[in-house]
Swiss-Prot record:
Species of origin: Shigella sonnei (strain Ss046)
Subunit composition and interactions: The complex is composed of two ATP-binding proteins (CcmA) and two transmembrane proteins (CcmB).
Protein name: Cytochrome c biogenesis ATP-binding export protein CcmA
InterPro entries hit by this protein: AAA+_ATPase, ABC_transporter-like_ATP-bd, ABC_transporter-like_CS, ABC_transptr_haem_export_CcmA, P-loop_NTPase
Record-linked PROSITE patterns: ABC_TRANSPORTER_1 (PS00211), ABC_TRANSPORTER_2 (PS50893), CCMA (PS51243)
Length: 207
C-alpha cells in the first residue's frame, strides 16, 4: 500500500475525456512530474489529488483510505499551491506567513522569506509586490510547512533562474526526508533523471 493512490481515474470536461483508467501509487520519498500537452488535464488531475474536485469515476486514496473518509487528516498532511498564489494581498509578506503558519515564530518566517529570495520585503503589502515576488511569498511556505505531501501547479512561473534552483533544492531535500512532491512545470528540472518519476497524461495509464 502506497501513501497516495489513484485508482482508475476518469475525468471528462465538456463531453471530452481528459484521461481515463489512470492509476498510480506514490510512496514516501517520491518526486513526481505530471506531464502532458496544454489541455491534457494536468491541473485537473492535481485538483483531484487535493480533493478539491471529484473524478467522474475512480477514486483517490490516502494511506489506503478514500479521501472523503479522511479529509481532515489528509489536509493536515497536504500543502497545495495552485496557479494563483492564494495569498492575502492586503497583508504583508510576513503577515501572510504568520496567517498560514500560526505556530511559526517571526524568526522562522523571516528565514523562510529569505530562502525564497524575499529578504527585506517582509513588511511590504503583497499588493505592492510584482507577480514573481507574490509567487515567492506563497512558495516561502515550503520552508515552514510540516506537510508530508506537496502538490504544486507550475511553481516556477515568474521565478528567475536562481529562484528555480533554490526551490528545486528544497523539493529535493523534502523528498530525501521522506516527503512526496507532485508538480507540473514547463521548465526542465535541474536534477538527475533518476530522481524524477514522470506520469504522462498523453497515455491513459501510469504504473
Amino acid at each position: 500500500m502506497g501513501m497516495l493512490e489513484a485508482r482508475e481515474l476518469l475525468c471528462e470536461r465538456d463531453e471530452r475525456t481528459l484521461f481515463s483508467g489512470l492509476s498510480f501509487t506514490l510512496n514516501a520519498g517520491e518526486w513526481v512530474q505530471i506531464t502532458g500537452s496544454n489541455g491534457a488535464g494536468k491541473t485537473t488531475l492535481l485538483r483531484l489529488l487535493t480533493g478539491l474536485s471529484r473524478p467522474d469515476a475512480g477514486e483517490v486514496l490516502w494511506q489506503g483510505q478514500p479521501l472523503h473518509q479522511v479529509r481532515d487528516s489528509y489536509h493536515q498532511n497536504l500543502l497545495w499551491i495552485g496557479h494563483q498564489p492564494g495569498i492575502k494581498t492586503r497583508l504583508t509578506a510576513l503577515e501572510n506567513l504568520h496567517f498560514y503558519h500560526r505556530d511559526g515564530d517571526t524568526a522562522q518566517c523571516l528565514e523562510a522569506l529569505a530562502q525564497a529570495g524575499l529578504a527585506g520585503f517582509d513588511d511590504i503589502p503583497v499588493n505592492q509586490l510584482s507577480a514573481g515576488q507574490q509567487r515567492r511569498v506563497a512558495l516561502a511556505r515550503l520552508w515552514l510547512t510540516r506537510a508530508t505531501l506537496w502538490i504544486l501547479d507550475e511553481p516556477f512561473t515568474a521565478i528567475d533562474v536562481n529562484g528555480v534552483d533554490r526551490l528545486t533544492q528544497r523539493m529535493a531535500q523534502h523528498t530525501e526526508q521522506g516527503g512526496i512532491v507532485i508538480l507540473t512545470t514547463h521548465q526542465p528540472l535541474n536534477v538527475a533523471e533518476s530522481k524524477i518519476r514522470r506520469i504522462s497524461l498523453t497515455q491513459t495509464r501510469a504504473a
